[in-house]
Amino acid sequence: MPYNPIPQISLWAAAITSVGPMIAFAAIMILLRKKPRASAVVSLAAVTASLVCAVFLLIRHWGMEMPMQATVHWMVSGDMVIPLGILLDPLSLLMLVVVGVICFLVQVYSLGYMAGDPGFSRYYGFMSLFAWAMTALVLSPMLLQLYIFWELVGLASYLLIGFWYEKFSATQAGKKAFIMTRTGDLAFFLGILLLLAAGGTINILELNNIVLPGGLNSLLGALAALLIFGGIIGKSAQFPLLTWLPDAMEGP
């Protein structure tokens, strides 16, 4: 599938949507652990900037004729190059706004919900980690990059479910969620490896060029799709990997 380069202003906006929460997470966990008010301000500022940039990108590029992509080389080994990048298409633009709105509303609500909790700063640090992982996942043009942030989403979920770690039930709930979702994630990773072996690439747009015209073996394609769907089942608590969800209520 052909694509256009990302204009500079849009590239900066896309970077801010993801990098802002990442910086907030690092700042809170390293510098602001004992400053709850500052932690909330930094986290909310980052997620607000992320939402504003997401809305800007949606308005600016909605109705685009071709997706836009920018990549850089991350790891090079012989003839194998593993890039990182940003992909903007109608689906990712819409999901960026959805993620931004939900993260913003949750963090605003949490100002009152978590008020007075000894782990207030830590909570906002974990929420910033969650926002970073989600936005970076949505922007990923490579399946390996997507998988890395998929796992970071799982880590953030584990940290939030087991947030009140003084309670044995909370730590057990966190472990249960982590282990059960890893089962699905293993299937997801195997699906990615199968697509790489069958198609020779982990670039989503390049895979579209191979799959849509029927250039991928139908059996391998179906198996890869089922494996990737297994990861989705685990993360979204669908049958049979759903018993961790009620226990997740142990977290905030």
Named regions from a protein language model:
Residues M1-P252:
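...captures the hydrophobic TM-helix bundle architecture rather than a specific catalytic motif
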